């Protein structure tokens, strides 16, 4: 039996999937058949720590019968979005509202703000000038980098007091150089999740003499299943993707880094088909510098995407179409340079219409021309910075011509041809190297045994 408000549980439902711009009036209209306690005041929206709508809300109703009516609205649409309705209670509602939003204990009173959209190569001195007149604590500026040592376009700044931090927030959308800077409330905990790169990677920058593909818990093993989703979160989605979850060594599912200490989130993010299965759509890049988008509104056009990245000028936009002929909510955006692609990542989690969009970097410094295909494959990733022709083709190992030979969970003979200029990775073009490749592969297998 459901207890009344005096018993502590109340008559509460939780709503998920609301449009980001949803108002209390719209929620009231959605539940027009139900009696909401205190009208609009009985609708409690949930916000992120940056103060943005999360797409969820609690609704307080007047009786158990009203709760039952509200639950019948589950999976009905608001605009063009399906809205989920769950049974909840006062205890859950109070806890969630206390621990989320910009004024939660995790974000209040520590003087931190997060900057997004910094120009490529922005220095701490430029940030100090940007906040001229506002006191920053000593060593209070943190500039996160990715696993390749590149700037993420973000920064964390700790001010001498929360009051000063509040003043800093008023500089939201002001410029550094030609870039608009977004400023959000932050916390020490958020800084730690973005800035503590795994120390073990430092010892993995160069391959050892006995490194070999596919050996046990080796760095090349690419698993399937839960690890893919963890990988897809990427370093820009809070934390460091697959590494934090699996300590970088995979254990057969998910992956953190390859033999050379590179984060595989960057190399494999941007794959198209999320059914963890067979292939998917293929996008051919002419520059090798792409950003993959996920979470687009289904009515988004190419022009919307060009405007989203303004003032950057993408070379080309490719909106993905699924096997059923419908848009997937994903797209690939090609840029002229690696620097432009990195700068575009500053728009990660920014809104397009009512949805926030996730971005995944698919660019390698120094890559020039050549096409790559992003598909789900069971091969380990072979990619070298500065490769010409096809940045995702083959990698020569020790001068022995061992390229695209070993696979994880698939036939050892599976090939991914098209490496250097489209003719140096496949079996048919290896000619005299075939025998060497086979002998080396056999040696590796015997070493493993």
Curated annotation (Swiss-Prot):
The lineage of its organism: Eukaryota, Metazoa, Chordata, Craniata, Vertebrata. Residues 234-433 are annotated as: 2 X 16 AA Gly-rich approximate repeats. Each quasi-RRM repeat bound poly(RG), while only the N-terminal QRRM bound poly(RC) and poly(RU). None of the repeats bound detectable amounts of poly(RA). It comes from Homo sapiens (Human). Induction: Up-regulated in myotonic dystrophy pathophysiology (DM). GO terms for cellular component: catalytic step 2 spliceosome; cytosol; membrane; nucleoplasm; nucleus; ribonucleoprotein complex. Residues 354-392 are annotated as: 2 X 19 AA perfect repeats. This is Heterogeneous nuclear ribonucleoprotein H. Expressed ubiquitously. It is found in: Nucleus, Nucleoplasm. It is linked to Neurodevelopmental disorder with craniofacial dysmorphism and skeletal defects: An autosomal dominant disorder characterized by global developmental delay, severely impaired intellectual development with poor or absent speech, characteristic dysmorphic facial features, and variable skeletal abnormalities. Additional features include feeding difficulties, inability to walk or walking with an abnormal gait, and cerebellar or other abnormalities on brain imaging. Its main location: nucleus. There is a cross-link at residues 35, 87, 98 (Glycyl lysine isopeptide (Lys-Gly) (interchain with G-Cter in SUMO2)). It holds the Pfam family zf-RNPHF. Residues 11-90, 111-188, 289-364 form the RRM domain. This protein is a component of the heterogeneous nuclear ribonucleoprotein (hnRNP) complexes which provide the substrate for the processing events that pre-mRNAs undergo before becoming functional, translatable mRNAs in the cytoplasm. Mediates pre-mRNA alternative splicing regulation. Inhibits, together with CUGBP1, insulin receptor (IR) pre-mRNA exon 11 inclusion in myoblast. Binds to the IR RNA. Binds poly(RG). The modification Phosphotyrosine is found at residue 246. PANTHER family: HETEROGENEOUS NUCLEAR RIBONUCLEOPROTEIN-RELATED. Keywords: Acetylation, Disease variant, Intellectual disability, Isopeptide bond, Methylation, mRNA processing, mRNA splicing, Nucleus, Phosphoprotein, Repeat, Ribonucleoprotein, RNA-binding, Spliceosome, Ubl conjugation. The modification Dimethylated arginine is found at residue 233. SUPFAM superfamilies: RNA-binding domain, RBD.
């Amino acid at each position: 039996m459901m207890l009344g408000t005096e018993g502590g549980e109340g008559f509460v439902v939780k709503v998920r999937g609301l449009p980001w711009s949803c108002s209390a009036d719209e929620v009231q209209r959605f539940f027009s058949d139900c009696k909401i306690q205190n009208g609009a005041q009985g609708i409690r929206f949930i916000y992120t720590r940056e103060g943005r709508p999360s797409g969820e809300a609690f609704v307080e109703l007047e009786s158990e019968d009203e709760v039952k009516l509200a639950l019948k609205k589950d999976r009905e649409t608001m605009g063009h979005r399906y809205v989920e309705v769950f049974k909840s209670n006062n205890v859950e509602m109070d806890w969630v509202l206390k621990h989320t939003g910009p004024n939660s204990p995790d974000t209040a009173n520590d003087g931190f703000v997060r900057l997004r959209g910094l120009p490529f190569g922005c220095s701490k001195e430029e940030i100090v000038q940007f906040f001229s007149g506002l006191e920053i604590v000593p060593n209070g500026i943190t500039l996160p980098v990715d696993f390749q040592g590149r700037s993420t376009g973000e920064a964390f700044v700790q001010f001498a007091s929360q009051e000063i931090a509040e003043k800093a927030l008023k500089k939201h959308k002001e410029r550094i150089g030609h870039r608009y800077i977004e400023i959000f409330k932050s916390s020490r905990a958020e800084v730690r999740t973005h800035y503590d790169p795994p120390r073990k990677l430092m010892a993995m920058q160069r391959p050892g003499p006995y490194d070999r593909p596919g050996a046990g818990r080796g760095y090349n093993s690419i698993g399937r299943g839960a690890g893919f989703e963890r990988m897809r979160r990427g370093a820009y989605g809070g934390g460091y993707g697959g590494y934090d979850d699996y300590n970088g060594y995979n254990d057969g599912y998910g992956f953190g880094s390859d033999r050379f200490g590179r984060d595989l989130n960057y190399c494999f993010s941007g794959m198209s088909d999320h059914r963890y299965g067979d292939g998917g759509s293929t996008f051919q890049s002419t520059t090798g510098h792409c950003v993959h988008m996920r979470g687009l509104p289904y009515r988004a056009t190419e022009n919307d995407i060009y405007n989203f990245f303004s003032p950057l000028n993408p070379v080309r936009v490719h909106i993905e179409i699924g096997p059923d002929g419908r848009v997937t909510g994903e797209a690939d955006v090609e840029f002229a340079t690696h620097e432009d692609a990195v700068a575009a990542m500053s728009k990660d989690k920014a809104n397009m219409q009512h949805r926030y969009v996730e971005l995944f970097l698919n660019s390698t410094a120094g890559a020039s021309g050549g096409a790559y295909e992003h598909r789900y494959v069971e091969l380990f990733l072979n990619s070298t910075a500065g490769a010409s022709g096809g940045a995702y083709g083959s990698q020569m190992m020790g001068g022995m011509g061992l390229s695209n030979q070993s696979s994880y969970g698939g036939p050892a003979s599976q090939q991914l041809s098209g490496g250097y200029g489209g003719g140096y990775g496949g079996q048919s073009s290896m000619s005299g190297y075939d025998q060497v490749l086979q002998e080396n592969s056999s040696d590796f297998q015997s070493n493993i045994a």
